[in-house]
Amino acid sequence: MKTLNNTKIIGIDHGYGNMKTANCCFPTGITAYDHEPLFTADMLVYGGRYYLIGEGHKEFAPDKIKDEDYYVLTLAAIAKELKAENLTEAHIVIAAGLPLTWTSGQKADFKAYLMKNSEVEFTYKKGNYHLYIDDVRIYPQGYAAIASFATTLKGVNLIADIGNGTMNTLYMINGKPQQGKMFTEQFGAYQCTLAVREAFMQKTQREINDAIIDEVLITGTANIASADLKIIKSVAAEYVRDIFRRLREHGYDESTMTLYVTGGGGCLVKNFYKFSADRVKFVEDICAAAKGYEYLAEAQVKAEAKG
């Protein structure tokens, strides 16, 4: 969170797997109730309904504004940032993002969705919040994660933002993004999870919990039978090979370009692909995009103030 003229700029990465701000990360899960649920540790109350934040798994949907879920998750994200500074009331500028090739088409609608209430009150974790949403700034995913050092990049670089739902790729030449060389594909890490589920069921006639799959994808291993681990690792390796096949289809050349991998799916490349450390770099910070949105919004607002 950044402060500018008594306004809080809060970057929010509305991921399909996790919601991220500059300082926190929580699952993109939400369950709504008409009556107060039994367990209320992570409960948000808004508009007369009760929401458990982080519960369940929100399925991939290209249109994030089709229901209230991402709006309520946004309120929770803002509350988490404000709580870190012991605030419950503030004027807010939301800095958010959309997949690269969807930004221009969905930008106005997503901004209107997040700004539908210029003033909003809600309760989160028994704390009462009063927000004034002064503005929403929307930026392209992928680029935001490297925005703070983009101008230092030399030569031809490819940015691959591998999220849970989508993979966004963007070419940078001497620090400048190439408008005509950016791509968005529905090929995020969750596609790998689905492939593991299917392969595991076919080979063992058993179901496997997503928590185990996630552990293997993130760390490269898990305390399970070696035969079961082999199935997961085999599918993950094939998924990563497919990532690089797609990158090459978009013109990626490992010998002449540097690849920057961002997003939660970067761990799959680390764990299941043999790469040259000189040619493949990782943006390790899971909150990098949210921080990038804040960086871009602050720079933009300051530039506008100067006229």
Predicted segments, located by residue:
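PRPP/pyrophosphate-binding module of the type I phosphoribosyltransferase fold
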Residues: 169-174
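Ser/Thr-glycine-rich phosphate-binding loops at phosphate-binding pockets of nucleotides
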Residues: 162-168
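Nucleotide/phosphate-binding catalytic cleft detector across ATP-hydrolyzing
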Residues: 1-159, 176-191, 203, 211-307
